[in-house]
């Protein structure tokens, strides 16, 4: 993102944002409601275009791309996980994933089953959403997001509706994906989710007010504590 601003009428959702995320990074985006977090993830995910500035994704400046091109980039390069599960109630877990495969023109039940195995739900493949817990439904959504082998995995409050146990399971899945080389960008209100990322930015009133490298050790205080 280079000098990115996004304006809706009189609302300045983002103001002059400069942000670089490298391949393989894990970034968390935090901040109060209305600070611009979801707007930022929508721009990165090619679901919206900036009012000014440029968003460059794998060499593509999305502000200059056509709607058809943005759809293709989103289909080929991005996996999306939302707070709401958006599963089709009358389809099984594996069928919900295969619906996403049709979008990517690659229906393959074997690959859909493999994606469910990856998130620990191989034995739930034939279950309907109503037969799954909230945590299991979110894991189906993660499997669905992975089906096109995306370059970037984007999450907008992916643990927002989960209890502590299922939140931990989802975080562990994200850790595994990151170790395998995935680029992960997650919007969250939850400090525990935000703190597991390599890097954390905090937004306020559409501006980045903190940019924290969380891979660096904390400086020891003089009394022996940690800064």
Q: Which positions does each model-derived feature cover?
A:
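ABC family nucleotide-binding domain
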Residues: 2-205
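Conserved beta-strand-loop-alpha-helix hinge in the C-terminal portion
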Residues: 207-227
């Amino acid at each position: 993102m280079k000098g990115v601003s996004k304006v809706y009428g009189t609302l300045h959702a983002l103001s002059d944002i400069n942000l670089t995320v490298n391949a393989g990074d894990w970034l968390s985006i935090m901040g109060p409601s209305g600070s611009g977090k979801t707007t930022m993830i929508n721009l990165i995910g090619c679901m919206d275009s900036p009012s000014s500035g440029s968003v460059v994704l794998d060499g593509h400046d999305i502000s200059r791309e056509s709607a058809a091109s943005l759809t293709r980039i989103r289909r080929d390069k991005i996996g999306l996980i939302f707070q709401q599960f958006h599963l089709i109630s009358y389809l099984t877990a594996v069928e919900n994933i295969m619906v996403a495969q049709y979008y990517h023109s690659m229906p393959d039940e074997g690959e859909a089953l493999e994606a469910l195995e990856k998130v620990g739900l191989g034995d739930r493949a034939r279950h309907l959403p109503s037969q799954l817990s909230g945590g299991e439904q979110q894991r189906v959504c993660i499997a669905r997001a992975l089906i096109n082998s995306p370059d970037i995995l984007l999450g907008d409050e992916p643990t927002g509706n989960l209890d502590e146990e299922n939140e931990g399971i989802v975080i562990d899945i994200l850790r595994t994906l990151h170790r395998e080389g995935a680029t992960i960008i997650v919007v969250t209100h939850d400090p525990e989710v935000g703190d597991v990322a390599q890097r954390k930015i905090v937004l306020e009133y559409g501006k980045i007010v903190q940019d924290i490298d969380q891979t660096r050790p904390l400086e020891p205080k003089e009394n022996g504590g940690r800064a």
